């Protein structure tokens, strides 16, 4: 809940923080956004992470947390796509869209640098999950990357690319994922591909 999330992100004993928290349970409208750490200071939200040549992204990123229960504990052993993830509320999405649009404009953040924890740490993190509104953020708020849907519809009628493991690794790494192109379809590569699909094909 909101109170637990605030305590988790502000009490030093937990060793985790974020620049912003978007609550869930408040009846205030529009939904308030809590700034917990100044933009100019480091927050501890990404942990061991990488995007392109940058590692340890706490030092170079703004962290936004959204109160969400994720999935029930009994779904832990199920594949990610079979888990019953909690949807985000429309009030949360509106608050997130307004906040991220402001931050993107203020700091001139490119679309492909608006990322999930699962993008920058795919072997450790699954948030914000399959219900995160990437498409809505891109199309309605101008935030983040989303494919051109007309071009996407055309590509769906073409044969799937016959890339081997190295081909997939090279393309994932080129986009930004922390994948070492080795030609071996290892867990690092599988996790990066899952993260890419979670972002663009939830």
Can you describe what each PLM-predicted range is?
Residues 2, 122-131, 199-202:
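Secretory-pathway/luminal and periplasmic proteins that interact with or process carbohydrate-rich
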Residues 50-51, 80-92, 123-124, 154-161, ...:
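Second-shell loop/turn segments in exported
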Residues 73, 85-86, 124-138:
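Helical (often loop-to-helix) elements that flank the catalytic cores of nucleotide-handling enzymes
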Residues 156-202:
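Short acidic, glycine/serine/threonine-rich helix-capping segments at coil-helix boundaries
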């Amino acid at each position: 809940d909101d109170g637990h999330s605030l305590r988790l992100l502000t009490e030093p004993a937990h060793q985790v923080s974020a620049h912003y928290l978007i609550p869930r349970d408040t009846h205030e409208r529009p939904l308030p956004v809590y700034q917990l750490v100044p933009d100019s200071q480091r927050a501890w939200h990404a942990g061991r992470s990488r995007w392109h040549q940058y590692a340890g992204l706490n030092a170079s990123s703004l962290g936004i947390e959204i109160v969400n229960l994720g999935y029930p504990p009994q779904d832990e052993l199920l594949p990610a796509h079979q888990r019953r993830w909690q949807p985000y509320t429309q009030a949360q999405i509106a608050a997130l869209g307004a906040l991220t649009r402001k931050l993107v404009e203020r700091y001139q953040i490119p679309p492909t640098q608006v990322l999930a924890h699962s993008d920058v740490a795919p072997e450790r993190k699954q948030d914000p999950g399959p219900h995160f509104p990437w498409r809505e953020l891109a199309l309605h708020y101008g935030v983040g990357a989303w494919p051109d849907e007309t071009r996407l519809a055309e590509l769906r009628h073409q044969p799937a690319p016959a890339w081997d493991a190295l081909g997939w690794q090279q393309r994932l790494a080129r986009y930004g994922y922390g994948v070492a192109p080795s030609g071996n379809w290892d867990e690092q590569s599988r996790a990066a591909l899952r993260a890419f699909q979670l972002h663009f094909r939830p």
